[in-house]
Curated annotation (Swiss-Prot):
A GO molecular-function descriptor: structural constituent of ribosome
InterPro entries in the cross-refs: Ribosomal_uL16, Ribosomal_uL16_arc, Ribosomal_uL16_CS_euk_arc, Ribosomal_uL16_dom, Ribosomal_uL16_euk_arch, Ribosomal_uL16_sf
GO biological process, any: translation
Species annotation: Metallosphaera sedula (strain ATCC 51363 / DSM 5348 / JCM 9185 / NBRC 15509 / TH2)
CC terms in the record's Gene Ontology section: ribonucleoprotein complex; ribosome
Keyword tags: Ribonucleoprotein, Ribosomal protein
PANTHER family xrefs: 60S RIBOSOMAL PROTEIN L10
Gene that produces this protein: rpl10e
Cysteine pairs bridged by disulfides in the record: none
Protein name: Large ribosomal subunit protein uL16
NCBIfam families, A to Z: PRK04199.1-1 (NF003236), PRK04199.1-4 (NF003239)
Signal peptide range: none
Family: Belongs to the universal ribosomal protein uL16 family.
Length: 175
């Protein structure tokens, strides 16, 4: 069965479903790397991707946003040693789906809404407060516009509205 659209899982109600020791067959999250680049360098700015809505972000949307941000930064900056990109959200919540059959005679084969708990199909990160940090890039001053552009493209991969905030890491010298 194909993957349902992300809008089916964008909003949530009820407590998080995270106890993996009780859930058989939870698929692994697609996002595996959470830090990329050189974290030891001295950077001037941190560009943050913050949420403007409350909801859920599926693991494949997080991975797509991470990949496109990394690809944009490496193509514009040149190499991975001139910035530090990190993802702060982890997809803990297990998403379930009650699969329904849609063909002639399906009503004889399935139970409908009886025992409709569903089977695990993926994981999602829950955003519970406005302004939550999803990911951030630390850059030098000359790469600041590249980081903003990379996050603009990456935000199109996420199901929630986001905003890009620039935070200076060093004090500006006034002379």
């Amino acid at each position: 069965m194909p993957l349902r659209p992300g809008r089916c899982y964008r909003h949530f109600s009820g407590p998080a479903y995270t106890r993996k020791e009780y859930i058989p067959g939870v698929p692994q999250p697609k996002i595996t790397k959470f830090t990329m680049g050189d974290h030891k360098k001295d950077y001037d700015f941190e560009v943050r991707l913050l949420t403007k809505q409350i909801g859920q972000i599926r693991h494949n949307a997080l991975e797509a946003a991470r990949v496109i941000a990394l690809k944009q930064m490496t193509s514009m900056v040149g190499n991975e040693t001139d910035f530090y990109l990190y993802v702060t959200k982890y997809p803990h919540h297990v998403i379930r789906e009650n699969k329904m059959m849609a063909f002639a005679g399906a009503d004889r084969l399935q139970d409908g809404m009886r025992l409709s708990f569903g089977k695990p199909i993926g994981t999602a990160a829950r955003i519970t407060k406005l302004g939550d940090l999803i990911m951030a890039i630390r850059v030098k001053k000359e790469h600041l516009e590249f980081a903003k552009k990379a996050f603009k493209v990456a935000s199109s991969k996420l199901p929630l509205d986001t905003e890009i905030v620039v935070v200076p890491l060093k004090e500006e010298k006034t002379q």
